[in-house]
Amino acid sequence: NGYYYIMCAEGGTGYNHCVTMGRSKNVWGPYEGDPMNPIVTSVSGISYERQDPDHLKPKYYNPDSVLQKSGHASYVETSLGEVYLVHLCARPFAPELRCTLGRETAIQKMKWTEDGWLRMYDDDNLAKEYVEESRLPEYPVPQIPSFDDFDGEELGNWYYAPRIMPQ
């Protein structure tokens, strides 16, 4: 559509963590912010206090959202054109609001609007606990052996880390 997009995490990693987006016709900018920023958050309402030094404080806790501290997203588009954001989040236990499971990962179904902005599928911006699954067919993943006696001449592909191609 002629735009370059930039997706950012704002608000630190605390309760007002969020995902924001900007776009520009030039990769070097200037970028205009999405008028509906943040596009994914756990904070009530569209407006929030950015760069608040108390971003870790529970004053931003939203009791209406199971997922808290939602931010740092990655864009995923399926071969069917479905769009998702995968992001960090936490699920605190009340009343202390401690996140004993640490940082977790969640997924949100998204869509592109006619005016070229990314939105959650339901036009809200609060991270959802459940989303509609993809229409992609299941793809069986080969099972990784549970035992290896290393008697072969080469290591199996499962020993290689991402971005390191086997020779």
Name each model feature, range by range.
Residues 1-167:
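Carbohydrate-active catalytic/glycan-binding domains of CAZyme proteins
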